[in-house]
Regions:
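Aromatic- and glycine-rich peptidoglycan recognition patches
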Residues: 104-150
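Ribonuclease/tRNase effector modules and their secretory precursors
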Residues: 3-12, 20-21, 130
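Cysteine-nucleophile protease catalytic domains, especially the papain-like/related folds used
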Residues: 14-68
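Short, charge-rich amphipathic segments
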Residues: 1-2, 36
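Generic structural signal for residues positioned in beta-strands
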Residues: 31-35, 89, 109, 138
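...with weaker cross-activation on analogous glycine-rich loops/strands in unrelated enzymes
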Residues: 58-117
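Domain-length accessory/inserted modules outside core catalytic folds
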Residues: 26, 42, 50, 62, ...
Length: 150
């Protein structure tokens, strides 16, 4: 088992050596929400001292996270299946408290930023579910030809 697995196995019990690969080294500059939004120079979270869209309530609620992604052109209700013309983001929560976001890649796999740790590509949404990130509670989509910048 790798050092990564030693550190994260309990937190992400469904992530195995067979269902993910590391794509970027650890970086403190951004987190999973920023990464899902396509941003690598800010840590997105609705707490003081972190970036959060100005017109969105600074609260750790699903409604606030949906509103933040809506400003980027995303809407809820997308399917997790690959649709080449639709860029997708999955929001994870424990209860109704958002904990994580993943973005679908053009090949249908998903990419996640693990806190201040590594970026990974994982085969399924379930690979990072079931632990500290909770379960997928919303899948958002936007047309690839209509992408407001973050």
């Amino acid at each position: 088992m790798s050092a990564f697995h030693d550190q994260f196995h309990t937190a992400l019990p469904l992530l195995t050596a067979d269902n993910y690969r590391e794509t970027s080294p650890s970086a403190w500059e951004y987190n999973c929400i920023a990464w899902a939004a396509g941003v690598t120079d800010a840590w997105w979270w609705p707490t003081p001292g972190r970036y959060w869209p100005a017109d969105v309530p600074r609260e750790e609620t699903l409604a606030a996270f949906l509103a933040a992604f809506a400003l980027l052109g995303y809407s809820a209700g997308a399917s997790p299946l690959l649709e080449p013309e639709v860029e997708k983001v999955a929001l994870y929560a424990v209860g109704q408290t958002p904990m994580h976001a993943a973005r679908q890649l053009p090949d249908g796999t998903w990419t996640s930023k693990l806190g201040s740790g590594i970026d990974i590509q994982h085969d399924t949404l379930e690979a990072v579910a079931g632990g500290i990130y909770g379960e997928v509670v919303a899948i958002l989509g936007r047309n690839r030809s209509r992408q407001p910048s973050a």
